[in-house]
Amino acid sequence: LLCYTYMIIITTVNLKEITMKLSESTVSFLKNYANINQSLEFREGSTLRTVSPLNTILASVEIGEDFPKTFPIYELNRFLGTLSLFKDPELVFSESSVSIKDGSHESTYHYCGSSSMFQTPPEKEIDFPDAEVSFELSEDIFKKTINAANTLGLPEVVVQGDGKEIYILVSDTANVTSDSFSTVVGSTDKTFRMIFKLENLSKIMEGTYDVRLSSK
């Protein structure tokens, strides 16, 4: 009768540290996202996506960096504030935290327990219906429209067409004597009126946009 004794040796392998740096443009996008939702689930890859707590704003952007793993940050502004403590921060990722390093300085920032603690965008891209109205909104007109709404104390941004031209204007549609400020942004053969809350549009990052609108 032969008896064999097996000895199993389990060793821990130290994986190579995964490091990356964030560009100024990516940090700018993250600052804007913090206005939309205080929390963010960073997903593996080069796409940053967020959604407002009430599902009224969905934002998505392709960045130059490629995140090596998915991790949730509950207080995005706090995370960005920690980054700002460093001149040239380098991020080193582990299973439960990210280390932020620059020379002799280092901070360890822990991920939150689960992304189920806050609203996250859907995994799949939204299948946007065919646009009924489209136009280019320049950064200058976008800024002037938001500034006009704030100056006049008006709660809504309206995009409307009169069968000839497309206007973007600020107004209070509940008040028939409301002040207004409008700008022509395109032409159309349709008559329509679409109303948006200023509090939502004011969270959008300044820039020039190709606007596509649908009533569906």
Summary of predicted features, one role per range:
Residues P121:
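Acidic/charged, solvent-exposed loop-and-adjacent secondary-structure segments enriched in E/D, K/R, S/T
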